[in-house]
Amino acid sequence: MPSPPAMLLGGLLLIVASTTVAQRRGQEAAGRRRAHRVQHGQCSYTFVLPEPEPCPPEPEAFGGSNSLQRDSPAATLNLGDWPSQRMRQLEKMLENNTQWLQKLERYIQVNLRLELAQAQQHMVQNQTATMLELGTSLLTQTTAQTRKLTDVEAQVLNQTSRMEIQLLETSLSTNKLEKQLLLQGHELHRLQGHNSALETRVQALETQQQAELASLSGEKERLRRLLGRQSGALAGLERTLRAASSNSSLLQRQQHQLLESVQRLVRVMAQGPASMRAADQLFQDCAEIQRFGANASGIYTIHVANVTEPRKVFCDMEASGGGWTLIQRRENGSVNFQRNWKDYKQGFGNPAGEHWLGNEVVHQLTSRATYSLRVELQDWEGNEAYAQYEHFQLGSEAQLYRLSLSGYSGSAGRQSSLVLQGTNFSTRDADNDNCLCKCAQMLSGGWWFDACGLSNLNGIYYPARHHVRKLNGIRWHYFQGPSYSLRTTRMMVRPSGI
């Protein structure tokens, strides 16, 4: 709705416009105008005041339009005063208009000043409220940010504390491992010294044994000569006794004594050391050595048919009746079992420690007679188990040393961890298994893998505390599971029926 000053200004403009319309012709003739300008802030108001058109004298003043008048000096004088009177009237009207405009300007200025002050006050109040709202918002945001920073600081402190604790634990673990490593180093040096002492003792025992063998050989030769002399003496005595037997009881008693002496001598010769008698014999396996009288477990030499050179083997004369020929042993990881086909064919390692006798030797042994196989196992907790097969045979190299087993028994599982029939031997350079994945390369070692199978006693040797979850370790599935690497293993054979 328009304000009162605006309405008053509009009314004044309407009056001025009406006057202007009535007197437009006079204005155009005169060509003179008056303007009044009002300035208010950035806005200005300009009022144009036209000059009023002079009114001509009425016709009656000159005596009528249709009558002839005489020239009169008085009439002429009145007509000459009319413009000046009209000018005074217009000036007075202009002065009045000017006064009205000034009053209007003052009224507008006063009212506009009040409205401007009110608007400014309202604006200040709005700005103050806005600033208060902004301040409150900023304070709220600052509080929230401070809270977040406090939370982040607490999290950083917690994380720092955890990291310090982890660092301390890591440091303690490192110190513990260093101490364990130092202790293991000392233990290793001690074992090396002990091993050197044992080697020296073994060498001394070998030297002593060789000396005893030489002494026994000399004793044997001396006994042979003595036996020859005794035989000659007995022959002479027999002749003498025949001559005097009819009438000499004394000679009969002497003859009886001599016969007893000879019998004792023969028994002494028959009870000589088994090792001295075994030196002149050739044995094909440890069972023959045991039958000949040797009952001590150790290293012996055997001569296997169709094998050109004699082989040193370890004979177990105690387990399950003895007479076992070892074909494999794992105990400390000192021998690398990551070998090729040729190595597994010929054999490798030391018979007194870790070794593989050789597929060709085992094939020749098991092809001339029926053999049994015994597998002995021990885990890292000291538990022992065995698996025994009454019939064991290994095919030739042309047959890829194919495994044939039957008659399973033992404590190493409810069933065999070896495939009983038709499994070929595989190595890293000879993939003969029934899997596309090349089990020998994936699981390591040489073995009868089949389709990677349930066992592999020639896998990687893992020490204590590193022996679990090892698929490529020394495994026997039905004893300790598919990924438990065992501590020791032995495989040995002997003729069936013993």
Swiss-Prot record:
PROSITE patterns assigned: FIBRINOGEN_C_1, FIBRINOGEN_C_2
UniProt feature coiled coil, ranges: 85-109, 186-254
Keyword Signal: yes
Domain Fibrinogen C-terminal: 277-497
GO molecular function: receptor tyrosine kinase binding
Region described as Disordered: spans on this chain: 51-80
Record's subcellular location: Secreted
Any one of the GO CC terms: extracellular space
Disulfide pairings: C286-C315, C439-C452
Signal peptide region: 1-22
Listed GO biological process terms: angiogenesis; blood coagulation; signal transduction
Glycosylation positions in this chain: N96, N126, N158, N247, N295, N306, N332, N424
Annotated keywords: Angiogenesis, Coiled coil, Disulfide bond, Glycoprotein, Secreted, Signal
SMART domains given in the database record: FBG
Quaternary structure (record): Homodimer; disulfide-linked. Interacts with TEK/TIE2.
PANTHER family named among the record's database cross-references: FIBRINOGEN ALPHA CHAIN, FIBRINOGEN C-TERMINAL DOMAIN-CONTAINING PROTEIN
Summary of the function given for this chain in its UniProt record: Binds to TEK/TIE2, modulating ANGPT1 signaling. Can induce tyrosine phosphorylation of TEK/TIE2. Promotes endothelial cell survival, migration and angiogenesis.
Descriptive protein name: Angiopoietin-4
Source organism of this protein record: Bos taurus (Bovine)
